[in-house]
Curated annotation (Swiss-Prot):
It comes from Leiurus quinquestriatus quinquestriatus (Egyptian scorpion). This is Chlorotoxin. Belongs to the short scorpion toxin superfamily. Chloride channel inhibitor family. This toxin binds to the surface of glioma cells, and inhibits their proliferation without having effects on normal brain cells. In this context, this toxin has been described as a chloride channel inhibitor (probably ClC-3/CLCN3) by causing its internalization via caveolae. It has also been described to selectively interact with MMP2 (in complex with MT1-MMP (MMP14) and TIMP2), to inhibit its enzymatic activity and to decrease its presence at the cell surface. Disulfide bonds join C2-C19, C5-C28, C16-C33, C20-C35. One of its GO terms (molecular function) is toxin activity. The presence of a 'disulfide through disulfide knot' structurally defines this protein as a knottin. The keyword Disulfide bond applies. Is under several clinical trials (phase I, II and III) as BLZ-100 (Tozuleristide) by Blaze Bioscience Inc. as a fluorescent imaging agent that labels tumor tissue (CNS, oral cavity squamous cells, breast, skin) to enable more complete and precise surgical resection. BLZ-100 is composed of the chlorotoxin peptide covalently congujated to a derivative of the fluorescent dye indocyanine green. It is found in: Secreted. Transmembrane segments: none annotated.
Amino acid sequence: MCMPCFTTDHQMARKCDDCCGGKGRGKCYGPQCLCR
């Protein structure tokens, strides 16, 4: 699991992806960034 996802941050989806290793790899699920 990566950092928490903040709905106020419009870059969050990209940050989650980056944390998980690339585009489309991360998914914000509620307050958590989950990696596929």
